[in-house]
Amino acid sequence: MIPGEYAIQNGDIEINPGRETLSVEVANTGDRPIQVGSHYHFYEANNALQFDREKTRGFRLNIPAGTAVRIEPGQSRTVELVAYAGQRKVYGFQGKVMGPL
């Protein structure tokens, strides 16, 4: 292998296979664009985003790591979320959970 070389498998790569997912309609009620990162606990996303928060507890965006979704002011869109895995403990963000889910 050459340093920096990529070894990419053929076909599509499925992210988060076999994990629980859900789709949620989200609206930006604020006056500025809002970006939510791939691993941000969606339940604790910006308060200007209007959606069924309780339904999203323990979920994050089902998008590739390191990417984000941007929602413009007044925009509404459907996003797919995926359940957190591992120990299912959430700390930080807006401090609404701070422990086990």
From Swiss-Prot:
Gene3D superfamilies: Urease, beta subunit. Pfam families: Urease_beta. CDD domains: Urease_beta (cd00407). Its EC number is 3.5.1.5. InterPro entries: Urease_beta-like (IPR002019), Urease_betasu_sf (IPR036461), Urease_subunit (IPR050069). GO terms for biological process: urea catabolic process. Pathway: Nitrogen metabolism; urea degradation; CO(2) and NH(3) from urea (urease route): step 1/1. GO terms for cellular component: urease complex. GO terms for molecular function: urease activity. The keyword Cytoplasm applies. The keyword Hydrolase applies. It is found in: Cytoplasm. Keywords: Cytoplasm, Hydrolase. It catalyses: urea + 2 H2O + H(+) = hydrogencarbonate + 2 NH4(+). PANTHER family: UREASE (PTHR33569:SF1). Heterotrimer of UreA (gamma), UreB (beta) and UreC (alpha) subunits. Three heterotrimers associate to form the active enzyme. Belongs to the urease beta subunit family. This is Urease subunit beta. It comes from Alcanivorax borkumensis (strain ATCC 700651 / DSM 11573 / NCIMB 13689 / SK2). The lineage of its organism: Bacteria, Pseudomonadati, Pseudomonadota, Gammaproteobacteria, Oceanospirillales.
